[in-house]
Amino acid sequence: MNFDMSKLMQQAQKMQEQMKKAQQERENMEVIGESGAGLVTVTMTGKYDVKSVSIDNSLMSEDKEILEDLIAAAVNSAVKKVEENSTASSNIYKMAKDAGIDLPSGINFPFK
């Protein structure tokens, strides 16, 4: 079996390009988290920046603590969606395979 260093470098470069693209896609994504059956919504970017918070007028007469809990739940919902939609970690095995690299399963990558 011959070891082709140039082929390995090409595969690694291709995988690096795919990882960069996946990271850019994550940074450009927007998700909406909600709570209280949609009465509170939070729009968040893939970089975890909150872009907007919307509170239904019907909640304005509610107790302050209830409103705070609903906002926190909506933010947590948005964070969870960003993590679920992250392509960088969820597709790393596919990217490696597409680049011609066969990764063993069970590798813990230092990113999400």
UniProtKB/Swiss-Prot annotation:
GO molecular function: DNA binding
Key word Cytoplasm present: yes
First-listed, main subcellular location of the protein, grouped into a coarse class: cytoplasm
Region feature (Disordered): 1-27
Superkingdom of origin: Bacteria
Keywords in alphabetical order: Cytoplasm, DNA-binding
Pfam families documented for this protein: YbaB_DNA_bd (PF02575)
HAMAP family to which the protein is assigned, alphabetical: DNA_YbaB_EbfC
Family that this chain belongs to: Belongs to the YbaB/EbfC family.
UniProt protein name: Nucleoid-associated protein FTL_1411
Annotated organism of origin: Francisella tularensis subsp. holarctica (strain LVS)
